Structure formats: C-alpha cells, structure tokens
Amino acid sequence: MLDKLLQKFRDQKKPVFHKEEGYWEISALRKWAAILIIAFGAGIIYIVPYFAFFQFKTAVANVTGVEPNRISLLLTAYGIVSLLFYIPGGWLADRISAKALFSVSMFGTGIITFWYFLVGLKGIVWITPN
C-alpha cells in the first residue's frame, strides 16, 4: 500500500511549486551558504543576551560596577520585555519581508555583541580613571 502511494508521487510530472522563472535557480553552494548564515544568525540572536549575563556575570559585574543581583534583575527585565514584544513582532513579521526583518535583527545583534566586546576591554585597553 505504501509502495503504491510513493509510486504515485514519483510518477507525477507536475512541479510541487509553481516557480517563477529563475526564482529557484540558484546553486547548491549558495543555498547551503544561505542556510548556514540563517541558522548561525538565529542561534546567535537567542544566545548572546543570556550567554553574556549567565556565563560572564561576575566579569560584567566587575567591569561595569553593577552588583550581580542587579544583573539578574536586568536579565529578568529583558525576558519580560521580550515576551511583551513577541505579539507586535509577529504582527510586524506579517507586513514586512522576512529578509528585511532578519537583516535588521542581525545588525542590532551585531551592535550589541560588539558593545559586549568593548565592555570586556574596559580597563585592559583603555586608560580609565580610578
């Protein structure tokens, strides 16, 4: 029974997608590169805020002068604000292209990650008053 069903799908000559001319005509290497970039970016978007606060809480507290308990409170506030913006973000995703939203979010994540990097260099590279 399963073989007949699979054979029926194999014998169909209709394409699954009604493709526009040239839309699906990109090389396999470019497809895999795009998938890799999207997967890496999606992972980084969720990891950066939590990784910086959980893994480097003591280092961030020492560099910024903020108590570790306050950093935990900031992480809680980040989670609540993120939760509140999920619904408007979904509404926005229905009206703006996914490529534009992904580009903006990756740019913002890059700026925040670079800021984390600069915070970590405070006192090592820059001469700061005591």
Swiss-Prot record:
CC annotations in GO: plasma membrane
TM region positions: 34-54, 73-93, 107-127
Name of protein: Uncharacterized protein MPN_112
Entry membrane topology: Multi-pass membrane protein
Principal subcellular localization: membrane
Keywords (A to Z) from UniProt: Cell membrane, Membrane, Transmembrane, Transmembrane helix
Compartments, record wording: Cell membrane
InterPro entries: MFS_trans_sf
Keyword Transferase attributed: no
SUPFAM superfamilies for the chain: MFS general substrate transporter (SSF103473)
Coiled coil: none
Protein species of origin: Mycoplasma pneumoniae (strain ATCC 29342 / M129 / Subtype 1) (Mycoplasmoides pneumoniae)
Lineage: Bacteria, Bacillati, Mycoplasmatota, Mycoplasmoidales, Mycoplasmoidaceae
